[in-house]
A protein has these predicted regions:
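Conserved ABC transporter NBD signature motif
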Residues: 57-72
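Conserved ABC ATPase "signature" region
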Residues: 96, 107-122
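The feature captures the beta-strand-to-loop junction immediately N-terminal to the Walker
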Residues: 34-36
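H-loop/switch region of ABC-family ATPase nucleotide-binding domains
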Residues: 186-187
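Catalytic Walker B motif of ABC-type/P-loop ATPase nucleotide-binding domains
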Residues: 151-155
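Helix-to-loop junction immediately C-terminal to a conserved catalytic motif
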Residues: 49
Length: 220
């Protein structure tokens, strides 16, 4: 398995916010996390990303343990509550700041990913003047521009109009076909059922239901 979440529990100040969660995925699959606000979707993504450490259990990527103190073993793209962009920079310049120090993405590739999310690479419009939908599109572009092995998208449809949702579906399909594992959270049943190979329903930090596309749903 490329991704393994093994019996992960997270407690904060004595409160259990993630309870004994396990899931796994091979490459080239889309995993949906579904639940209302506060159900634990974002916290689980933070645990998978290594931004925070589990109280119990392990997250493994390609057999390597992920933790706050160990560099992420494979490339990672993240949209969790939106990345921080500079207000006075354009979309193009913001992505250059992220990409160039790593040396993994060329200017042409940045232009291409901006076009994919339907933002004009030539626009000099400052980020602080972006609509919420434009900000979300830029966040998605930042998450996928390096074509990482694992992509975490937390509520990526927030602030997107219908064309934006279609754009997101196209990107998810493309990255899946490339072999990435995508974990996408949403409270929107229809969108997740459309794009996901399997869905985990969360309630109060616990998996209460697991369904695989084309199979009968199982209770957690």
């Amino acid at each position: 398995m490329f991704l393994e979440v093994k019996n992960v529990t997270k407690s904060i100040h004595g409160d259990v916010v993630i309870k004994n969660v396990s899931l796994c995925s091979e490459r080239g699959r889309v995993i949906g996390l579904r639940g209302i606000n506060g159900s634990g979707k974002t916290m689980l993504m933070r645990l998978i990303s290594g931004l925070i450490r589990p109280t119990k259990g392990q997250v493994l990527i390609d057999g390597e343990v992920v933790s706050k103190d160990i560099p992420f073993p494979k490339s990672l793209g993240v949209l969790i509550e939106g990345p921080a962009f500079l207000d006075d920079y354009s979309a193009m310049d913001n992505l250059k700041l992220i990409a160039y120090p790593k040396g993994k993405v060329t200017e042409d590739e940045i232009k291409a990913v901006l076009s994919e999310v339907r933002l004009d690479p030539k626009s000099r419009k400052k980020y602080k003047k972006f609509s919420l939908g434009m900000k979300q599109r830029l966040g998605i572009a930042a998450a996928v521009m390096e074509h990482p092995d694992l992509i975490l998208l937390d509520e990526p449809t927030n602030a997107l109009d219908e064309s934006g949702v279609d754009m997101l579906k196209d990107i998810v399909k493309k990255e899946k076909e490339r072999g990435a594992v995508l974990i996408v959270s949403s409270h929107d049943r229809d969108i997740l059922e459309d794009i996901s190979d399997e869905i985990y329903d969360l309630d109060q930090g616990e998996i209460v239901r697991h369904s695989i596309k084309g199979e009968k749903r199982s209770e957690g």
